[in-house]
Amino acid sequence: MDIWEIIILRPMINVLIVGSKFLFNSPGLAIIVFTILIRAVMYPLTKKQLLSSKKMQDLQPRIQELQKKYGKDKQRMAKEQAALLKETGITNIGCILPMLIQMPIWIALYQSITRILATGPEELLNLSRYLYPSWHIVFPMVPLNSHFLWLNLGSPDRLVILPILVGGSMWIQQKMVTPTNTDPQQAAQSQMMLIMMPLLFAYMTFQFASGLALYWVVSNIISIVMQYYITGWGGLTWFSKKNSQPGKPTKPTSAPKILPPAK
């Protein structure tokens, strides 16, 4: 075995099998609980990412001022914007770090699902290589029941339900952290990403094991809940206005005050 299999893949396979044992012999429930645990461990990074996104939204008035002042000088504009981000402590890596960390988890989870749901003799023999000999509880569990709700966790979902859940939940999660931007070019890029990413993951749901798509749905829902309690509805302005109480004073924004000219 290589380092990837020893450090990541093999532990994940055994944890999912043991989790299925204690969760009514259901790999689907094991994936859901596993997702919750992963997101709980990543909570500090996720919170930092959300707060950085919120700061970026609050900085939009100052960024717009820079665009008006240095709009024609792209080099000076980039320099001033970088200085502003440095001043406020916002880093691009802080915004994308949770996504980068989750990518190896996606790969390992996909590989784990395809192995733990083995049914053929050769597949079961290959699975036995990954089981811990000292964990006697895992051997009677194999082969696992691959069915969860309407899904066969080892195969793509041929219905439209799971792709809609994946794409819809990802769109909501991304919309909440997408800052309002008056710059036409950046606004167009944000809108393109807001549309393309959910469509891409919805398409991938038709290609990969539905167990991985189940992880995406649960992870997106957890992200939506976290974002609501940490930063509010964010870019979902329509939903935020609809649920606001009439007559309730709004919190002051962090936009700089404009003082009258001196006499």
Language-model-derived ranges and their functions:
Residues 1-263:
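Helix-loop-helix
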